[in-house]
Amino acid sequence: DGQVVVVYDNLEESWIAGIDAATGRENWRTARDEQRSWATPLVWANELRTEIVVPGMNRNRSYSLTGELLWEFDGRMSNLVIPSPFAAHGMVYIASGYVGDQHRPSFAITPGGAGDLAPEGLDGETSHI
C-alpha cells in the first residue's frame, strides 16, 4: 500500500511505524512495550485481511496497516527473538530460539484473531493458535 514498515525495538524506546515510500514521511507510529528484537516483521496478506506480524520478547503482536493492534499474546519467547515470522498453508508461524537457551517456542496462527490470543500453558492452544 505504498509504505515501508519499520520496527525499532530496543532497551530505551520501542515502536513500529509506517513510512510513506514515495515521500519518506511517517504515516503512523505505535509504541511497543518491548526490549530488543532482531526479527523482521512480516506483512501477511491472508484470506481475511493484511496484517503486520511482529514477534517480541514480551508479546507477539499483529498490527493493521495503520498501526492498530489486532492481536497479541505472551509467547514466553527465548532470550532473544531472532527468527522472522513466515506464512504458509494459510497460517503465520512465529518461532524463537537462541544459542544456549533451551526454550525455543513455535506457534502456528490462523487468520482472524482479535485481542489477547494467549494459550493456556506452554503447550496450550486457542481458536487461533
Q: Where is each model-derived feature located?
A:
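Noncatalytic, solvent-exposed loop/strand surfaces
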Residues: D1-I129
